[in-house]
Amino acid sequence: MAASKDRENFVYIAKLAEQAERYEEMVESMKNVANLDVELTVEERKKGVAILDFILRLGAITSALGAAATMATSDETLPFFTQFFQFEASYDSFSTFQFFVIAMAFVGGYLVLSLPFSIVTIIRPHAAGPRLFLIILDTVFLTLATSSAAAATAIVYLAHNGNQDSNWLAICNQFGDFCQEISGAVVASFVAVVLFVLLIVMCAVALRNH
């Protein structure tokens, strides 16, 4: 009688142990699934940031090359002239505007060359090397874009308002089309600068969360 009761207790304890083992396996499986979901969420977030990086680079390319092209084609000749003088305004009459065209062309060229690295960050969201490479060069070309845009802005301001202290006369009353073109080029260059800042901030955040 006692042996039968001991056997029943042993079987009962064995069943409890088996159930406890199954419960532990189930809990472990749930933890693995939860961790996998977190990893997928982080990867998807980084991939989304990489896709946005690519889109912003396309926008910056359009702005930079558009600014360079608009400035390079800015030219206006007044319909009247004298025997010895012809009144013309062109970007190559100003060394600052020449620097602007060259700088924005370099910026646009760099952005085009940076697209493959941006694509790599989409394919491999966890890769830190391409992001670090991009953030360094983005900072360099942001400096170039900002300096050229700021210098051109100063000349555009003088073209619109002149400077009485230096006896510099405003020319936009006579060369209206020319001033519209150079003003549009400067605005486009600052759009590129803003997009550069966004790109750098995004890369920095992505590297910080790596």
UniProtKB/Swiss-Prot annotation:
Keywords on record: Cell membrane, Cell wall biogenesis/degradation, Membrane, Transmembrane, Transmembrane helix
Major place of residence: membrane
TM annotation in the entry: 49-69, 99-119, 132-152, 185-205
Membrane topology: Multi-pass membrane protein
Coiled-coil regions listed in the entry: none
UniProt source species: Glycine max
Biological role stated in the UniProt entry: Regulates membrane-cell wall junctions and localized cell wall deposition. Required for establishment of the Casparian strip membrane domain (CSD) and the subsequent formation of Casparian strips, a cell wall modification of the root endodermis that determines an apoplastic barrier between the intraorganismal apoplasm and the extraorganismal apoplasm and prevents lateral diffusion.
Entry protein name: Casparian strip membrane protein 4
Protein family (similarity comment): Belongs to the Casparian strip membrane proteins (CASP) family.
Subunit structure: Homodimer and heterodimers.
Ranges in the topological domain labelled Cytoplasmic: 1-48, 120-131, 206-210
GO cellular component: Casparian strip; plasma membrane
